[in-house]
Amino acid sequence: MSALRLRKVDALLAQATRALGAGRRLGFSSRGQHAELSLLPLLEDARIPADGVWLNTAVGPLLLSDAEALLSLLGEVPFTLGGEHQGWYWQLFNQRLSPVVADLLAPVAPFSDTPTELAIGCRVHVRLGSERLDTRLHAAPATLLRLLGSADWQVLNRNLDESWSVSTPLIVGELSLTREQIASLRPGDVVLPARCRFDSAGQGSVTLAGRQWAARTDQQAQHLFLQLSHEEHSHHEY
């Protein structure tokens, strides 16, 4: 059997992926309407889009696909990449960004260079009134971490699929037997464990995920329920 070889992952990339998690949501207002900006994990093709545009921001360079539509929803001045942009246009655009977005990204400015460091991608979803937009954002892991840490983002939680299950042995007791003793056992023999994990009332302990959990068993309608509790967590029933 060959040894399991795990893919090496850059430490900052792993940290940024964990920080993004199932996604983040940021509320803001634009054009007198409530809006939401969501960053979500990019589960499909994560390659950098050829039509993406690099822009410099307060948190670092960001590559945006469909940048004109995205940035136009984040403020009151339509964003365009056409023509020659003069300094006054960028100043006006940044001044008319939503205050929440401006605190996060401003000043937004052209970025002529293409970063050579590794980039991580995520989906971007914007909701403004009846308008919806889905696009993509790519950035260096350190930049994404600054982006996630520079505003009051709401952490999104993904509901666990009820069909997903984890199997783990439930050890109720332990006993050491020699090979000869095991060979001498016959059907109907009663074996008493030398160390019991549960008492006769169904109280005991379970080691799960590297932690020691207080456990209590309960039987209802021919089903055995196991209640686990930990001082850092609320009760969990299975």
UniProtKB/Swiss-Prot annotation:
Membrane topology, from the record: Peripheral membrane protein
Keyword annotations of the record: Cell inner membrane, Cell membrane, Membrane, Virulence
Main location: membrane
GO-annotated cellular components: plasma membrane
Keyword Membrane belongs to the record: yes
Ranges where the record places region HrcQa-C: 66-238
UniProt subcellular location: Cell inner membrane
Domain of life: Bacteria
Disulfide bonds: none
Coiled-coil residue windows: none
Functional description taken from the UniProt entry: Component of the type III secretion system, which is required for effector protein delivery, parasitism, and pathogenicity. Probably participates in the formation of a C-ring-like assembly along with hrcQb.
Domains: entry comment: The HrcQa-C domain interacts with the hrcQb C-terminal domain.
Quaternary context: Interacts with hrcQb.
Name of the protein: Type III secretion protein hrcQa
Gene name tied to this protein: hrcQa
